[in-house]
Regions:
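Nucleotidyltransferase catalytic core that binds NTPs
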Residues: 1-188
Length: 188
């Protein structure tokens, strides 16, 4: 009997309980599920690729048929490289559907043997996105229940560092914004 392997691609910056919900349900549908973290040089992520991978590996440690990997390039090409038969995509709203439908049709054109499987999140996660979680955390709001505890802890650590940096005194002889720009360049 043919084993069905799927990938669940995304930036996962940060991983949320909505992602975990789809991973859990996807692991019941597919024989093997690869959570594939996209390395996108066009984006400036909050968490490094290594941090996101560690968080997702911790979140999925209880699933025997789930692994975590990173990739760059076209998702369908990655699917072929790892011999996956399907791409799992979460759909929260009509706006997600319109975008994901276009991507699925293009992926089918590029690689007809790779199917896209749309999954709806559990109702309590239908509004949840990594972007919203980041915004709430940056503004000091509660993200309890939106992300696993490990992710909440990592987000709080990031926000504490960012808050301390934002409130630090600039180097002598510079304006506050110039001082921050120079500090950022030194870290890069």
């Amino acid at each position: 009997m043919k084993r069905i392997k799927a990938i669940y691609p995304g930036s996962f910056d940060p991983p949320t309980n909505g992602h975990l919900d789809l991973i859990e349900r996807g692991s019941k549908i597919f024989d093997e599920l690869v959570v594939a973290i996209l390395r996108n040089p066009e984006k400036d992520p909050l968490f490094s690729l290594a941090d996101r991978r560690k968080m997702l590996e911790a979140m999925t440690a209880g699933f025997d048929n789930v692994s975590v990997d990173t990739f760059d390039g076209l998702t369908v090409d990655y699917a072929l490289r790892v011999e996956a038969h399907a791409i799992v995509r979460g759909i929260r709203a009509i706006s997600d559907y319109e975008y994901e439908l276009q991507m699925a049709l293009m992926n089918r054109k590029l690689q007809p043997d790779v199917e896209t499987v749309f999954m709806l999140p559990a109702e309590q996660y239908s509004y949840l996105s990594s972007r919203l979680v980041r915004e709430i955390a940056q503004l000091g709001g509660s993200i309890n229940g939106l992300v696993p505890e490990l992710v909440e802890q990592k987000l709080r650590e990031k926000m504490d560092v960012a808050h301390k940096f934002a409130n630090s005194e600039p180097p002598e002889g510079t304006t506050p914004s110039e001082g921050r720009k120079k500090s950022r360049k030194k870290k890069a």
